[in-house]
Amino acid sequence: MSHDTAAGDATAPGDETLTVYTDYVCPFCYLGEASLEQYRAERDDPLDVEWHPFDLRSNERGPDGEIDPAADSGKDEAYFEKAKENVRRLQEEYGVEMSLDIAREVDSKNAQQAALFVREEYPEAFAAFHERVFDALWQDERDVGDPDVLAEIAADVGSADSEGAEIDTDKLRAAIDDPEREAALKGRFREAQQAGVTGVPTFAYAGHAARGAVPPEHLRRLIEG
């Protein structure tokens, strides 16, 4: 859970693409999405954006890959209270309504695996699915680690997209349980670490990066110089 504005070492895959490293369970990532949308709305030219998953709770996972309730996250109550204070400040600054009462036990791994599936198989629906997963957690307080919730989101996105094919929710459920897709997701997590990403959100563009829910003007400087 990061909210500082320090530059990092992460690099984007292409000079004209903004890579956003993010995790659905991070409130600052949700706020960062809002800042990015404000910046994109102010731009004259379109901006290519690539989502890259990041495992914010990697140090809490057991050998089976699941969250271990007994694991020490290294964060105490004072940390979480300070984080909430920062979230509230940014909510007001960016005009974002969101709940801070979600369970800390929510695991985003299934959501990120489902999102990779949607991006690969239904690319025209990815942006809407990605947004709805964030909204489901931070607006509706739903457990986005639940395959039923993810299937419902996929069905809603597909039915609302008149230009693309509806997302096959049976295939989405199968993708969540697919060991090969899980291995691919873990590979993306490793790529983020190898790129020097240590916190989220991280925005990377042309060899430069900004970390945290930075305001639109910071994104403008990152991208436009």
Labelled PLM ranges:
Residues 33-137, 141:
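Structural alpha/beta surface segment adjacent to cysteine/selenocysteine redox centers
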Residues 12-13, 74-78, 163-166:
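A broad, low-specificity signal for short, low-complexity segments enriched in glycine/proline
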Residues 3, 21, 25, 33-47, ...:
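C-terminal cap of thioredoxin/glutaredoxin-like
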Residues 13-19:
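Extreme N-terminal starter segment of soluble prokaryotic enzymes
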Residues 1-11:
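Secretory targeting signatures
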Residues 28:
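Short, cysteine/histidine-rich loop/knuckle motifs that typically chelate Zn2+
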